[in-house]
Each structure stands twice: as C-alpha cells, then as structure tokens.
Amino acid sequence: MLILTRRPGEALYLDDNIKITVLSVQGRQVKLGLEIPAETTVYREEVYLKIKEQNRLALENTEQDLLAATELWQKKEKK
C-alpha cells in the first residue's frame, strides 16, 4: 500500500488521466475530489465488496444449474 500525505488543496495523479485532490479534512473525515474519465467506474469499498460477493454467488448458482440441467438432459436421453 502506498501511503501519501497531502494537505487540503493538494493533489496527486494516477497515470495521466486521474487527479485526486484533498478538498477538506474535518476530524476523522477527508473529503476528496476525483477528476476521472467518464468511462471509469468508482465504487465505495463496501459496495464493491458486495458486488464481488454477489457475482461470486451468481457464478456458483450457474455452475449448479448447469450440472442439474446436464443431469436432466442425460436422464431424458436414456428414455
């Protein structure tokens, strides 16, 4: 993990197209401004982790559904 220190009004760049500016610091909260390309997706961590978990569960269900469908197909062909 890269750890940086910035004061309000100071910024940093990621590659050439993402600028992150510290807008303010109040107590334990830091307000950031992000200048990013429109096609860049940004999620809060808790939302991102939930999406990843839902995708994982959907993939598991798909595998189980495919196995069940294969079994049904094989039973149907035996008749």
Curated annotation (Swiss-Prot):
Pfam families in UniProt: CsrA
InterPro entries linked: CsrA, CsrA_sf
UniProt GO MF annotations: mRNA 5'-UTR binding
Cellular component terms (Gene Ontology): cytosol
UniProt keyword terms in alphabetical order: Bacterial flagellum biogenesis, Cytoplasm, Repressor, RNA-binding, Translation regulation
Gene Ontology BP terms: bacterial-type flagellum organization; mRNA catabolic process; negative regulation of translational initiation; regulation of bacterial-type flagellum assembly; regulation of carbohydrate metabolic process
Keyword Signal: no
Subcellular location: Cytoplasm
Family (UniProt): Belongs to the CsrA/RsmA family.
HAMAP family assigned: CsrA
Described function: A translational regulator that binds mRNA to regulate translation initiation and/or mRNA stability. Usually binds in the 5'-UTR at or near the Shine-Dalgarno sequence preventing ribosome-binding, thus repressing translation. Its main target seems to be the major flagellin gene, while its function is anatagonized by FliW.
Subunit structure: Homodimer; the beta-strands of each monomer intercalate to form a hydrophobic core, while the alpha-helices form wings that extend away from the core.
Protein name according to UniProt: Translational regulator CsrA
Gene from which this protein is expressed: csrA
